[in-house]
From Swiss-Prot:
Domain of life: Bacteria
GO biological process assignments: translation
Keywords: Ribonucleoprotein, Ribosomal protein, RNA-binding, rRNA-binding
One MF term in the entry's GO annotations: rRNA binding
Name recorded for this polypeptide: Large ribosomal subunit protein bL9
Gene that produces this protein: rplI
SUPFAM superfamilies, per database record: L9 N-domain-like (SSF55658), Ribosomal protein L9 C-domain (SSF55653)
Source organism: Pseudomonas syringae pv. tomato (strain ATCC BAA-871 / DC3000)
A GO cellular-component term linked to this record: ribosome
Nucleotidyltransferase keyword on record: no
InterPro entries assigned to the protein according to its UniProt record, in alphabetical order: Ribosomal_bL9, Ribosomal_bL9/RNase_H1_N, Ribosomal_bL9_bac/chp, Ribosomal_bL9_C, Ribosomal_bL9_C_sf, Ribosomal_bL9_N, Ribosomal_bL9_N_sf
Length: 148
């Protein structure tokens, strides 16, 4: 299935690229989420007319993400949780908790943007957490977990 990408897609291509993908990936993900359109002659012509508008929109999204990344780089978030004597938490700190703490401190972050590669935080201490704001922009935030 041949498609034209309407935005940058990780491991696939950039805005305006013609790509060949498996039919299921195109029908179930790229087309419904508005990330691509079928590469027909009419759609190619329509895309070329809208290219400047789409490129400006993509540049605005990236600039917004870079601004948020600069704000996050200066930020250190403290989360209080109940813990046992040895520093092991009763429960865990997940992406939702970190996103809520970052939003409360003034920077809007969705839980899907927070990356915890080793799973949830289950101990008291300081952790560096990656926040994936855009396909090209990633920030690191220091999260301090203290016992209540």
């Amino acid at each position: 299935m041949q498609l034209i990408l309407l935005e940058k897609v990780a491991n696939l291509g950039n805005l305006g690229d013609k790509v060949n993908v498996k039919a299921g990936y195109g029908r179930n993900y790229l087309l419904p989420y508005g990330k691509a359109t079928a590469a027909t002659a009419a759609n190619v012509a329509a895309f070329e007319e809208r290219r400047a508008e789409l490129e400006k929109l993509a540049a605005d999204k990236k600039a917004s993400a870079e601004t948020r990344a600069a704000q996050l780089a200066e930020l250190e978030v403290t989360i209080t949780a109940t813990a046992g004597d040895e520093g092991k938490l009763f429960g865990s700190i997940g992406t939702h908790d970190i996103a809520d703490a970052l939003t409360a401190s003034g920077v809007e972050v969705a839980k899907s943007e927070v990356r915890l590669p080793n799973g949830t935080i289950r101990n008291v201490g300081e952790f560096d957490v990656a926040v994936h704001l855009h396909s090209d922009v990633e920030a690191t935030v220091r999260v301090v977990v203290v016992a209540a």
